[in-house]
Amino acid sequence: MTEKSHKKTAKGRAGSPSPTSARNKKADNGARGNKVSERLKAVKELQKTETKKARPEHVVNLIGDALWLMGLAATLYLVISLISFDMGDPSWSHSSPVVEDVANWGGLFGAYVADVGYYLFGWSFWWWIAAACVMLYKNFRLHAKQTENEAYNHKIAAAALFVLTVFSPVLEYFVLGGKYADSLPVGAGGMVGIRVGAVFAWLLGKSGSLLIILVVLLLSLSLLVQISWLEFLNGAGRAVQNRLSALSGKVMALGKRRPNTKTDGVDTQNTRRMVKEAKNITAKPVALPEGSSSNRKSVAVSVAPPPKIQVSLFEDDEPRQAGEYHKPTLNLLRIPDSEPVSINPAELERTAELIESKLAEFGIGVQVVSATSGPVITRYEIEPAQGVKGSQIVALSKDLARSMSLQSVRIVETIAGKNTMGIELPNDKRQDVMLSEILSSPVFAEAKSKLTVALGKDIAGTPVVGDLAKMPHLLVAGMTGSGKSVGVNGMIMSMLFKATPDEVRFIMIDPKMLELSIYDGIPHLLCPVVTDMREAGQALNWCVAEMEKRYRLLSHAGVRNLEGFNQKVEAAKAAGKPLLNPFSLNPDNPEPLEKLPMIVVVIDELADLMMTERKAVEQQIARLAQKARAAGIHMIVATQRPSVDVVTGLIKANIPTRMAFTVQSKIDSRTILDQMGADELLKYGDSLFLQPGSAEPTRLQGAFVSDDEVHHVVAFVKEQAPANYVEGLLTGEAAQETANIVSPNADSDELFDQAVAYVLESKKTSISSLQRQLRIGYNRAANLMEALENAGVVSPSDLNGSRKILAHKDHL
C-alpha cells in the first residue's frame, strides 16, 4: 500500500462519521427537541392557567350583578306582597273561602308569604325589607368601587336581623297590644311578640322589658346598618351648629340694613291708602280730569274685601250635658290666610285699554267704565258705542280670548239695572275660597233656615249662601274636575253645621260609591248611603209615600207647610194638649204627634239612575219636585252628563234652581241653564247659579272643602249620636207600611194579586206562610191577609187563628 492510499484512507475515515457518533448526535437532538416541547407545553399550561385565573373574575362580576338584580327583584316583590296583604286571601294562618281572584298583587305565593311574615312577626316583618335594602345598598357601593376598604359583614348583619325580628315584635306587642286584629292574622307583634313578650313580662316586668328591648334594638340597628351612633350624633351636631351659624349671620346682616319705607319704587303708604279707598268705591264710572291724555272714563275699581273670620277655636264655654247633641265647630275646618286680593289699579287700567284696543281691531267701539275684581275673575263693564249690537260683542268672545292670550273670556250681554255689558277675564292668580270663610260670614250665621247651604263667593268676593227650602230643589251639573262633587259636599257640610238630626235628615244616593259614602253612619241619615240602584228606587218610593203621609197630617192639622205644622205641634205640647196622631195603628189610644224633620234627598249621579230605573226614577223625582216642598222634602240632584236624555224636560220643568259648573259643550250648557256660558268657565269651582225667577245666572267661585275636613266633621258628628235608620226603607216594606197607614186599603199593594193566587193554590191561610212565600215582612203580610179578608177571599180568623177559603178560581 502506498503512501497516497494511506492518506485517502485516513481522509475517508475522517470525513465519514462513525455509527457511534451518529447515534450520540441523534440522541442529543432528541433531548433538545424534548426540552423545547416541554417548554411549549409549559407555556401553554401557563397560558391556560392565566386564562383560568382571569376568567373567574369576569364571571364572578356577572354572577354578582345577576344576584344583586335578583335580590332587588325579590325585595320589590316582597314589598308589594306586604302592601297588598288582604285577610280575605288564601293563607296559611287561617282558613278562608276559596276565591278565584287573589287581591294580593303578588298572587297566591305573595299572599302566603305576607301571611306567614305577618303571622310570625306582625308589622316587625318589615325589618326584613329594611335589612334587604341596606344589604343591596352596601353591595352596590362596594361593587361600584364607591368605597375603599369597606366590606359589609353579612354574618353580623344576619345576626342583627335575627335579634331585630325577635325583640321588635315584643316591643310592638307591648306598645300596640292586641290592635290591628282585623288587618293582621294575630294582631300586632305576631306570634313571636305574643310568646316572647309573655316570657319577658313574667321575668322582667313590662317596664324593665321595654328598657332592655329598646337598648337591644338600638344596638342591633347599629350592627345592621353598621354605623356608629356616636359618629351619627356628632355629625348631626355639626350640621345643626353650621345651620345656626348661618342663620345668625343672616340676622346680623339684616340688622345692619337701613329701614326703607319704599319697596321697588312703590310708596307703600300710598298703596295702602289707594287699596283702602278702592274697597269703598262702587262700580260707577268716574270721569277723568280735564287735560288727561285719554278721553276714556277712568275705571272704578271694586276690590274683593279680605275674609273676616271670627272662629271659636274651642268648644262652647257652657258645660256639656250628657246625651245633648252639639253642632260641629269651625275649628274642624281649615282656616285660610286672611290676605286681601292684591289689586294693582294701574294693571286694571292697562287691561281696560287692551280690551278697548282689541275690540277696536275687530271694528267694535266700546268704553270700559268700571272693573270689579273677585277671587278668580275680574269683570270689566263696557258701554258699546252707538249702533253696536250686543250680539256682535258676544260673538267675539273666542277671538278676544285668543288675542289677549287667555284661556277663556265670558261676555255677559245684560247686567240687571245697568245699560252696560260685562267682560269677565280670569285673574293671573286664583284665590282659594274655603268653606270656613262662608260658614263664618255674617250672611250664613244670621240665616235662620236649617237648610242654608254655602255656595261660594261672587265676582266681588262677597259670600253667597242659598236656602234650599226656598229653592226648593237644586239641579247641579258639571264635568269631571269642574268641582261639582266638592260643591255638593260643601252644601251637605253646611247643613251639618246648621241643623241637628231632629231637624234635618238625609237620604244619599251614590252610584259611584266614592263621593257620599264618607257620610255613612252619621245620625242625620234615614238609611245607609244607597249604592245599589234598585235600592235607590225603593228609597224614592219611600219619599213619595212619606210625602203623601205628611200631606194628610198637614191637612188634618189645618196648616199649609211643615214649618206651620211643627209650630202647631210645639204650641199644643207647651199648652199641655198635644195633638194626637189621626193615623195611629191603635185608634183607641193614639200616640201624640211629634215635630217632623225636613228631608233632603241627595243624588250624586242622576245618569246612572236614569240608565237603570228610568221610568220609575223620572216619575218619582217629578212627583217629589212638584209636591214635596210643603211637606219639607227637598232634593239636590247632580250629574256630570247634563244631556237631554238624563236631564229630561219633566225634571227641568219641576226644578227651576240650577247650578252649572264647567260643562263640555254649549249644548250641555243650554240643557242645564237654558243658555250658553257654562262651557266657558274655568273649572275648579267656577260656576253659574241660576235662581228661580231670574233670567241671568250669577257667577260664583265655589267653596272648597277637603276630604280631611269632611272626615273631621263626620267623626265629630258620629260622636254626638248614633245612626238611626228607618227599618225597611231600602226593601220597600217601609214605603208600603207608610202607604197603608195613610190609605188602609191594602188591596192597592202590588203583591195583592200574588197573595190571592198563592192562597187559592196552596190552600194555606196563615200569615207566616204568606210571609215566607212572598219574602216580605210580617206587618206587610198581615195587611195583605186583612185585605184578603176584606175582599172576601178568606174568612175572619176563628178562635184557633185559622181561616177558611171562601173564594174559588172560577169566581175571580
Curated annotation (Swiss-Prot):
Gene3D superfamilies: 3.30.980.40, P-loop containing nucleotide triphosphate hydrolases, Winged helix-like DNA-binding domain superfamily/Winged helix DNA-binding domain
Record key words, sorted: ATP-binding, Cell cycle, Cell division, Cell inner membrane, Cell membrane, Chromosome partition, DNA-binding, Membrane, Nucleotide-binding, Transmembrane, Transmembrane helix
Record-annotated membrane-spanning stretches: 63-83, 116-136, 156-176, 184-204, 210-230
Primary subcellular site in the record, as a coarse category: membrane
Record's keyword annotation contains Glycosyltransferase: no
Basic residues bias locations: 1-11
UniProt record similarity statement: Belongs to the FtsK/SpoIIIE/SftA family.
Oligomer status and interactors: Homohexamer. Forms a ring that surrounds DNA.
Protein name: DNA translocase FtsK 1
Membrane topology type: Multi-pass membrane protein
Domain FtsK as annotated: residue spans: 461-670
Compartments where found: Cell inner membrane
Functional note: Essential cell division protein that coordinates cell division and chromosome segregation. The N-terminus is involved in assembly of the cell-division machinery. The C-terminus functions as a DNA motor that moves dsDNA in an ATP-dependent manner towards the dif recombination site, which is located within the replication terminus region. Translocation stops specifically at Xer-dif sites, where FtsK interacts with the Xer recombinase, allowing activation of chromosome unlinking by recombination. FtsK orienting polar sequences (KOPS) guide the direction of DNA translocation.
Compositional bias annotation for Basic and acidic residues: 25-36
One GO molecular-function entry: ATP binding
Record note on domains: Consists of an N-terminal domain, which is sufficient for the localization to the septal ring and is required for cell division, followed by a linker domain, and a C-terminal domain, which forms the translocation motor involved in chromosome segregation. The C-terminal domain can be further subdivided into alpha, beta and gamma subdomains. The alpha and beta subdomains multimerise to produce a hexameric ring, contain the nucleotide binding motif and form the DNA pump.
CC terms in the record's Gene Ontology section: plasma membrane
Region feature Disordered, mapped onto this chain: 1-36
InterPro entries the UniProt entry points to: FtsK/SpoIIIE/SftA (IPR050206), FtsK_4TM (IPR025199), FtsK_alpha (IPR041027), FtsK_dom (IPR002543), Ftsk_gamma (IPR018541), P-loop_NTPase (IPR027417), WH-like_DNA-bd_sf (IPR036388), WH_DNA-bd_sf (IPR036390)
